[in-house]
């Protein structure tokens, strides 16, 4: 008599879940670029600062860059940072800087052009030129930062990114710059009479269309190099931060899909702000919240069984200041143990 079909699978072992920490990221010494991102308000900055702290214990030099206009890393470390890498107080090898790529190229005011028909026509052509490659100003801002950072030879760079849309533009900036440069080369003769004036207004000095194109071309080798590194899982990874709620889970899935399209490696998720009720101190609100979060945690574990999913607790205090960041950072390597009844 034939054996039931299920018998051959009866003793098959369950798939072991991956370690629920960021140890794999800390231990991967080949990594040069680590992005931390997700929906707004989920604790990206706390997680990225904590990751940078742990990396500083095992790497020669670590730089954390905030590309979020909110610039929360100054709040997290309780220290003001600027566009220049600044040493974080209390560390010898951890540096931080804050940039706002969205400022890029400001819109030119009408007053500059007055009533002159020729200048008015020039403005229209400039607007047409800039609109031909949307995002070029932001992308060039990223490109300049990358050029500077590459020259500083930090052993690893952590990006505390802005909410998802900005993050995807950051990861796509090499493509945007190359496309924009190609478009500029096509129309440079058309806009040449006005390029010098535009450059003066943007603070780039005297420059004609050929010089501007040449200046952009100088950054292309760096941009292409960074682009290749971004797509190399040995050098780049992305850590998604979320909370156990529907919208955050949805945004995380969308982000992971977009990262796959960009060929960016990602195999770590941090689920932050989890509520763990204390059996000795019953709280109906906490228990209700825990029940909701548990439902979405189960979904995440089913959906992302090939990811390291770190679970971090909601704390009764802000994670602010070097000492608090230090303490919180240990949770990235040691799974949190919730209170249990005796």
UniProtKB/Swiss-Prot annotation:
| Cystines in this chain | none
Annotated Zn(2+) binding lies at 283, 286
Subcellular locations according to the entry: Cytoplasm; Endoplasmic reticulum; Nucleus, Nucleolus
List, alphabetically, the GO terms of the cellular component aspect: GET complex; nucleolus
Record keywords: ATP-binding, Cytoplasm, Endoplasmic reticulum, Hydrolase, Metal-binding, Nucleotide-binding, Nucleus, Transport, Zinc
Gene Ontology biological process terms, A to Z: tail-anchored membrane protein insertion into ER membrane
Active-site residues per Swiss-Prot or TrEMBL entry: 68
GO: which molecular function terms?
Answer: ATP binding; ATP hydrolysis activity; metal ion binding
| Residue positions binding ATP | 39-40, 43-46, 245, 272, 313, 315
HAMAP family according to UniProt: Asna1_Get3
Q: Per the similarity annotation, which family is this?
A: Belongs to the arsA ATPase family.
- Quote the function comment for this protein: ATPase required for the post-translational delivery of tail-anchored (TA) proteins to the endoplasmic reticulum. Recognizes and selectively binds the transmembrane domain of TA proteins in the cytosol. This complex then targets to the endoplasmic reticulum by membrane-bound receptors GET1/WRB and CAMLG/GET2, where the tail-anchored protein is released for insertion. This process is regulated by ATP binding and hydrolysis. ATP binding drives the homodimer towards the closed dimer state, facilitating recognition of newly synthesized TA membrane proteins.
This chain's protein is named ATPase GET3
């Amino acid at each position: 008599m034939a054996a039931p079909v299920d018998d051959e699978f009866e003793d098959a072992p369950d798939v072991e879940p991956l370690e629920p920490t960021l140890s794999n990221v800390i231990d991967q010494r080949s990594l040069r670029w680590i992005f931390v991102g997700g929906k707004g308000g989920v604790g990206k900055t706390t997680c990225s600062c904590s990751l940078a702290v742990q990396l500083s214990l095992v790497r020669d030099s670590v730089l954390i860059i905030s590309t979020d206009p909110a610039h929360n890393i100054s709040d997290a470390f309780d220290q003001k940072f600027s566009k220049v890498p600044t040493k974080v107080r209390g560390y010898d090898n951890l540096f931080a800087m804050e940039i706002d790529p969205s400022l890029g190229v400001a819109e030119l005011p009408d007053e500059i052009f007055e009533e002159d028909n020729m200048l008015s026509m020039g403005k229209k052509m400039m607007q047409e030129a800039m609109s031909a490659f949307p995002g070029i100003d932001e992308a060039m801002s990223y490109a300049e930062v990358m050029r500077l950072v590459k020259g500083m030879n930090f052993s690893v760079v952590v990006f505390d990114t802005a909410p998802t849309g900005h993050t995807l533009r950051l990861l796509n900036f090499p493509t945007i710059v190359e496309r924009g440069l190609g478009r500029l080369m096509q129309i440079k003769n058309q806009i040449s009479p006005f390029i010098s004036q535009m450059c003066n207004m943007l603070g780039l000095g005297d420059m004609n269309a050929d010089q501007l194109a040449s200046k952009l071309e100088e950054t292309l080798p760096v941009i292409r190099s960074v682009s290749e590194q971004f797509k190399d899982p040995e050098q780049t990874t992305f850590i998604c931060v979320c909370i156990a709620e529907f919208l955050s889970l949805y945004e995380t899935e969308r982000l992971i899909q977009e990262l796959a399209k960009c060929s960016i490696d990602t195999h770590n998720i941090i689920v932050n702000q989890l509520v763990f009720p204390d059996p000795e101190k019953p709280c109906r609100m906490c228990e209700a919240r825990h029940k909701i979060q548990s439902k979405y945690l189960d979904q995440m574990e089913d959906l992302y069984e090939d990811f390291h999913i770190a679970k971090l607790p909601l704390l009764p205090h802000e994670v602010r200041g070097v000492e608090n960041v230090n303490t919180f950072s240990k949770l990235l390597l040691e799974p949190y143990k919730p209170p249990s009844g005796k």
